[in-house]
Design a protein with these regions (language model features):
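Short, basic/glycine-rich phosphate-binding loops at helix/coil junctions
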Residues: 43-60, 114
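C-terminal cap/substrate-recognition subdomain and adjoining C-terminal extension
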Residues: 94-202
Length: 202
């Protein structure tokens, strides 16, 4: 199987860290379960200037390296690799975040996973002149059998793969979303994802 895995809020608990950061920077307390929007400026009620500062801080190397692993992520990823599956981590983080992101993967036992920074969300506004290691035209040439993703904003990047099975990692901001089709399956944790792959691997 060729497997696509998103980084933030699939491999690590990014939103929980941003909730702590919102308290630290702006005194805004939004419990994790109340983060109803993928757009963090809406969830934390930030103006444009605050949002830019917030995202810049959240992408500093020491902050990225501090994100906690989502339970079970590295174990399942390494099981897949050991079983011969081809795993690519494709993140919407800018390329300026590549090195700390790569180090985070390595530090959490995922040294053999490929990492790509794809311009998923047009986030150049908060890190000026940022580059991405994977352009959309090249991404669309890639083929996957299964994807692990939490963001409804990313679902459009799967439309070129009609047979793709998408494991939607359950998060507060995707619970009210209507899935595009029956290939999208809500998963509450990595054990559920592991079970699905084990049962459907050829």
């Amino acid at each position: 199987m060729k497997i696509y895995v998103d980084f933030d809020d699939c491999l690590c608990e990014t939103a929980r860290s941003f909730a702590d950061l919102a308290i630290e920077m702006f005194g805004k307390r939004v419990p994790y379960e109340k983060i109803r929007f993928f757009e963090l400026n809406k969830s934390f009620e930030l103006n444009d200037e605050e949002y830019d500062r917030f995202m810049q801080k959240g992408h500093e190397p020491d902050v990225l390296l501090s994100y906690k692993e989502t339970p079970g992520a590295s174990d399942v990823i390494n099981e897949w690799l050991a079983s011969g599956h081809d795993v690519s981590v494709i993140t919407g983080r800018p390329y300026s975040a590549f090195e700390p992101s790569r180090k985070w993967l390595d530090d959490h036992g995922m040294k053999d996973v490929r990492l790509y920074c794809l311009n998923k969300y047009g986030r150049d506004s908060f890190i000026y002149n940022s580059d991405f290691s994977l352009e959309l035209e090249d991404y669309y040439k890639m083929k996957f059998d299964l994807a692990v993703e939490d963001s409804p904003k990313a679902f459009k990047f799967f439309s070129h793969l009609p047979d793709l099975k998408v494991m939607v990692f359950d998060r507060p901001w995707n619970r009210e979303v209507e899935f595009p089709n029956g290939n999208y399956i809500r998963c509450i944790d990595w054990q559920m994802i592991r079970k699905y792959v084990a049962e459907h691997s050829v």
